[in-house]
């Protein structure tokens, strides 16, 4: 590899307004790229900046607001900024948990979008050294019954219902297919239907795992000369620019973006889990990072930035399942079930042997360098040479205009809403109509597709208010500690009052956990909103942050991490502001968990 002091620079590309538009880079952002590099970028460098500065990866519109959230308590071991948050649950054990969105991919390709959403959140958990213990999901779809649809055009209504049915079936099958094959219990969650989600479903996946408190791993590179090892599935062309796609609203033709959606393999992920946990036990791993959004690009620059070091990577060594892949394609591919790790120099064979045992690719593709730069080589040529900080901490940060949110309805019901009430009204018919609603009727038809008992830790599965798992090896035999977990969100309430609606989401998730007998101790959030370039949307977002902060502070449940999903709009029509909260609580004795059903 060329030395860090070499005058060789990547070959510049011809940058046009059309090329910048294709990469969703503004003229102002391109000026920042020129300033960071001191020259015209190569095409590979432009692609790297495109994904790392996307809303999905950089949080450039939301970071200024997220700072207002409470993130610390005596139980918090790791807060926001890592692959997952971690809390201390006692007896030397810690719990890693997080919620993430996979909304845009699940609209374009429902099965794979939802499946890879589950796969991605599971990797976030075991990247920390934790074995996944449970998953849950919070889902939002358009109407699936004619009575719930509001479109007056019968033909449009029929097309909408047909499309929504296909999305629901694909998403639920994807979640079940991945989780069941991987071997992690699904404890349910919540599913709601509203017309505003017809063109933009929400698929928020939550996962939780256990790790010994002294065996936690972090996504940080260190140690000059340490080898950088690529492990897992081979790299293909699937998912290229997936992070950029997730940072845009849907327009006509968005369904043609199927190549941007990743393809998952739960059996490969199961092998990757076991191999990673076994390799961690060797003591030879210095740092490890999932190749999630932005793939190899994100994992290399984030590991380097966290450690204040650089990485030199040779793309010719990256295992590839397709021929003729360019450096641009390899760096931006979001092929699933892949990890990047840094091993101690001289102990790399210990790590490689573990992955060979599990039948997985494991290849040394680079080395840690003292210079804080990401340098990429392909066919012997330097194709990218970028300061790590310019991709991460120095990414654009926008103070978007925050408008004034006005409730869309009067606080008091109009007179006509009360006119039909009285003793002559058929209230039994009203009750039957309510019970038939997709939002009220049983969701058993969904959660019965999920395996909720695998691993034999489940105390309370789907169908109740919260899931409960026992923590083997804690407490006393037969009276182990337990973890309770619940998800909650109400877009309608947040639409009427973003701050109060967000507070209700926190409070209801905490109540669900408390109803099992557990003490709520920490939270994770998934913030689903529309286009942040609209002041009224930022008004919703800012108010929701204030509501979450106030409620979490009052309840003593700090935010340990989460996800922001913006641009949830289709043809200019946004979803309801939908903050979803995941709350985790601790039970001193899992056998004393209180079920949701009557017992006597």
Regions found by a protein language model. Give the residues of each.
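Glycine/proline-enriched, intrinsically flexible loops and inter-domain linkers
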Residues: 2-600
